[in-house]
UniProtKB/Swiss-Prot annotation:
Enzyme class: translocase
Keywords: ATP synthesis, ATP-binding, Cell inner membrane, Cell membrane, CF(1), Hydrogen ion transport, Ion transport, Membrane, Nucleotide-binding, Translocase, Transport
Domain of life: Bacteria
Protein name: ATP synthase subunit beta
Protein localization: Cell inner membrane
InterPro entries hit by this protein: AAA+_ATPase, ATP-synt_VA_C, ATP_synth_F1_bsu, ATPase_a/bsu_AS, ATPase_alpha/beta_chains, ATPase_F1/V1/A1_a/bsu_N, ATPase_F1/V1/A1_a/bsu_N_sf, ATPase_F1/V1/A1_a/bsu_nucl-bd
Record Pfam families: ATP-synt_ab, ATP-synt_ab_N, ATP-synt_VA_C
Family as reported in the entry's similarity comment: Belongs to the ATPase alpha/beta chains family.
Subunit and interaction comment: F-type ATPases have 2 components, CF(1) - the catalytic core - and CF(0) - the membrane proton channel. CF(1) has five subunits: alpha(3), beta(3), gamma(1), delta(1), epsilon(1). CF(0) has three main subunits: a(1), b(2) and c(9-12). The alpha and beta chains form an alternating ring which encloses part of the gamma chain. CF(1) is attached to CF(0) by a central stalk formed by the gamma and epsilon chains, while a peripheral stalk is formed by the delta and b chains.
Species the sequence originates in: Neisseria meningitidis serogroup C / serotype 2a (strain ATCC 700532 / DSM 15464 / FAM18)
Entry binding sites for ATP: G148, G149, A150, G151, V152, G153, K154, T155
Catalytic activity: ATP + H2O + 4 H(+)(in) = ADP + phosphate + 5 H(+)(out)
Gene responsible for this protein: atpD
Length: 465
C-alpha cells in the first residue's frame, strides 16, 4: 500500500504527492492516517501529484500529512443488512444502532448495464394520485422526475408517492437524500418507522451541511445498494423490483459545480461544470431495468428560479420516461398537488399502453384546460359575458377539472386536517370522463376541490347547498 503526502489544500480539493512508481488510479480511495478522512482521486496532475476531493471536512489538514492509498474505489456495504439502517456516503451507519450486519460490499463506481442486458416494460404503476395516474402515468421500471422550484411541494409529493407505492410495494426501496434538509431525512425515517415498512427501506443521507465531495458521491452510494438488490437472484434466477428515491438530483449537480473550478476546469453555461452531461449520464445510465430485475426511480429535481431551460434540469429531462412539473401558478391557486397538467408528460401516454378510454380522457382533459388557458386573457379583459355559450361551458368544465385534479395527501394530514385519499385508476378515469361529458354540469365547482373520487364531490355538493 503506497503512501503519499499532502502538498496543497484548497477547500474540499486536496493535492497529494506519491512516489512516481506508486501513483494511485482515478477514483481510488485514499485515507488520511491521522483522522481516517477519505479522499477520492479525481485527476493525475503529473510528477506523482494527484488531485482529490475530500469526502468530509478538510478543516485541520496540513501540508506534509501522510495519506495511504487503499488501492480500490470507495466501497460500501450492500445486502439485507442495510435495510432499516441510515448510512452516509462511505456506508458508515449514522443511526447509532451498531455496525451493519453484512459481509458483502461493492464499489460505488460501476459500469452501466450493457445494451443487450436492458429490458423495457410497459406495465403501469398505479400511484393513487389522480393527476399523475391520468396525465403522466408511471411505468414499472421507469424513471420519473418531479420538477419544481423552491417550495412548490417536490418533497411532499415524493413522500406521498413513497407512502402510496413503497407501503403497497412488497419489494425493497432505497432512499438517497442528496443535499437536502436534515429535518426531511428525519421525517422520512420516522414516517417509515411508524408505517412498519422500515425493514424494507435502506437510507443513504448526505445532507445540506455536508462538504461537496460527500454530496457528489452519496447518490452513487444509494444507487450501488439499489443495484445490488436488483441483481441479487433468488432460487428461480430472478432479481427484484426495487424502488429508488432520490431527493434531490439537482444537489448532485450543484456539488459537482462547487468543486469543478477548484479542480481547474473552465466553467460552461451559467457557471456549471463542463462535464455536466457526462456526470449526469454516468449516474442515470446505471438507474435502469435489466432482464434480471428492475429499478423504478423517482427523482426530485429542483428548478433554479423556476427556469426549466436551466442547464441542470434540461440535462435531466433527457433521461426520464415521465416528467411531473410542479407549477408555482397552480400552487398559488391553492391546488395541491401543484402539478402542471399541460407541462407534465409521460412516454406511457399512448393508447397502445393505456387503452383507448384512458388515452381519450387524458387528451380530453388536456385540450379542455388548454382552451381555458387561451380564453383566460379574453376573460381578464372583457369578462365571461362576452364568451360564446360553447366557450362558457368549456371554461366551467375546465375550472371543475382543475379543482378535481387536487387531492388531499396522507402525508399532509397534520397540516390540512383532511384525511388523505388514494384514488384507484378506474375511479380517476370514470370521474374525469363524467365531467368532460357534462354529467356534473349542475354541481358547483367548489364541490370538486380537495376530494378523492367523484362520488365524494357529489356528497360535498349536498353540504354546500
Amino acid at each position: 500500500m503506497s503512501q503519499g503526502k499532502i502538498v496543497q489544500i484548497i477547500g474540499a480539493v486536496v493535492d497529494v504527492e506519491f512516489p512516481r512508481d506508486m501513483i494511485p488510479r482515478v477514483y481510488d480511495a485514499l485515507k488520511l492516517d491521522e483522522n481516517g478522512l477519505t479522499l477520492e482521486v479525481q485527476q493525475l496532475l503529473g510528477d506523482g501529484v494527484v488531485r482529490t476531493i475530500a469526502m468530509g471536512s478538510s478543516d485541520g489538514l496540513k501540508r506534509g500529512m501522510t495519506v495511504s492509498n487503499t488501492g480500490a474505489p470507495i466501497t460500501v456495504p450492500v445486502g439485507k443488512g442495510t435495510l432499516g439502517r441510515i448510512v452516509d456516503v462511505l456506508g458508515t451507519p449514522v443511526d447509532e444502532a451498531g455496525p451493519i450486519d453484512t459481509d458483502k460490499s461493492r464499489a460505488i463506481h460501476q459500469a452501466a448495464p450493457k445494451f443487450d442486458e436492458l429490458s423495457s416494460t410497459t406495465e403501469l404503476l398505479e400511484t393513487g394520485i389522480k393527476v399523475i395516474d391520468l396525465l403522466c402515468p408511471f411505468a414499472k421500471g421507469g424513471k420519473v422526475g418531479l420538477f419544481g422550484g423552491a417550495g412548490v411541494g417536490k418533497t411532499v409529493n415524493m413522500m406521498e408517492l413513497i407512502n402510496n407505492i413503497a407501503k403497497a410495494h412488497s419489494g425493497l426501496s432505497v432512499f438517497a437524500g442528496v443535499g437536502e434538509r436534515t429535518r426531511e431525512g428525519n421525517d422520512f425515517y420516522h414516517e417509515m418507522k411508524d408505517s412498519n415498512v422500515l425493514d424494507k427501506v435502506a437510507m443513504v443521507y448526505g445532507q445540506m451541511n455536508e462538504p461537496p465531495g460527500n454530496r457528489l458521491r452519496v447518490a452513487l452510494t444509494g444507487l450501488t445498494m439499489a443495484e445490488y438488490f436488483r441483481d441479487e437472484k433468488d432460487e428461480n434466477g430472478k432479481g427484484r423490483d426495487v424502488l429508488f428515491f432520490v431527493d434531490n438530483i439537482y444537489r448532485y449537480t450543484l456539488a459537482g459545480t462547487e468543486v469543478s473550478a477548484l479542480l481547474g476546469r473552465m466553467p460552461s453555461a451559467v457557471g456549471y461544470q463542463p462535464t455536466l452531461a457526462e456526470e449526469m449520464g454516468r449516474l442515470q445510465e446505471r438507474i435502469t431495468s435489466t432482464q434480471t430485475g428492475s429499478i423504478t426511480s423517482i427523482q426530485a429535481v429542483y428548478v433554479p428560479a423556476d427556469d426549466l431551460t436551466d442547464p441542470s434540469p434540461a440535462t435531466t429531462f433527457a433521461h426520464l420516461d415521465a416528467t411531473v412539473v410542479l407549477s408555482r401558478d397552480i400552487a398559488s391557486l391553492g391546488i395541491y398537488p401543484a402539478v402542471d397538467p399541460l407541462d407534465s408528460t409521460s412516454r406511457q401516454l399512448d393508447p397502445m399502453v393505456l387503452g383507448q378510454e384512458h388515452y381519450d380522457v387524458a387528451r380530453g382533459v388536456q385540450s379542455t384546460l388548454q382552451k381555458y388557458k387561451e380564453l383566460r386573457d379574453i376573460i381578464a379583459i372583457l369578462g365571461m359575458d362576452e364568451l360564446s355559450d360553447e366557450d362558457k361551458l368549456t371554461v366551467m368544465r375546465a375550472r371543475k377539472i382543475q379543482r378535481f385534479l387536487s387531492q388531499p395527501f396522507h402525508v399532509a394530514e397534520v397540516f390540512t386536517g383532511s384525511p388523505g385519499k388514494y384514488v384507484a385508476l378506474r375511479d380517476t378515469i370514470a370521474g374525469f370522463k363524467a365531467i368532460l361529458n357534462g354529467e356534473y354540469d349542475h354541481l358547483p365547482e367548489q364541490a370538486f376541490y380537495m376530494v378523492g373520487s367523484i362520488e365524494e364531490a357529489v356528497e360535498k355538493a349536498k353540504t354546500l347547498n
